[in-house]
Amino acid sequence: MLRVGRTTEQQLLLGEWACLGVLYPTPTHGFAIAARLKPGGDVGRVWSLSRALTYRSLEQLAVRGFIQAVGEEPGIAGGNRTILAATRTGRAQLRKWLAAPVVHQRDLRSELLLKLIIADICNIDIDEMLELQRAGVAVMSEALTAQIEADPSDVVTLWRNESSNAALRFLDRLPRPHA
């Protein structure tokens, strides 16, 4: 099987975006990032990663030049912990990712929620993206409603329509501190 490497920022996995988002506001070590990405962590509530996958994501971010080692501190169980920080490029790519609406309805639950959590952690205003997101979901919802009217027995389209309507209600209920 041929494996093609990922080369662009849009090809980052959600776990990599989550790690970059945790590093954006302040440098820290991988163990602390992994703790935030546990299922009960502030970011892990939306997108959780095992410690091994967290470190793999950090390696991928370093290879792309989105994060770098900036120091060390003593570890609790011996050895030193490497302190990592988002690079200027990494910070710019994260802001660009946060500014882009989620394209596919199937990704709204995971990617949109992750963007909301990361934007809050990083104190980045995403109001414009949310307006674009709402407009895109509204267009999708209108098209699905028309399809349902044409064929009310299509359960897949009915499901997608109900999901898009729920997404619209969710987007409408979000607090807008910058509005």
Which functions belong to the PLM regions below?
Residues 52-55, 113-115, 147-150:
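Juxtamembrane/interface motifs at transmembrane-helix termini
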Residues 87, 110-113, 173-174:
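Short, charged/polar low-complexity linear motifs in solvent-exposed/disordered segments
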Residues 95-135, 139-142:
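Amphipathic alpha-helical dimerization/coiled-coil segments
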Residues 124, 128-130, 137-179:
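Charged, low-complexity intrinsically disordered regulatory/assembly segments
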Residues 42, 72, 99, 121, ...:
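Short, flexible helix-adjacent loops and helix caps
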Residues 2-106:
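Basic helix-turn-helix/winged-helix DNA-binding cores
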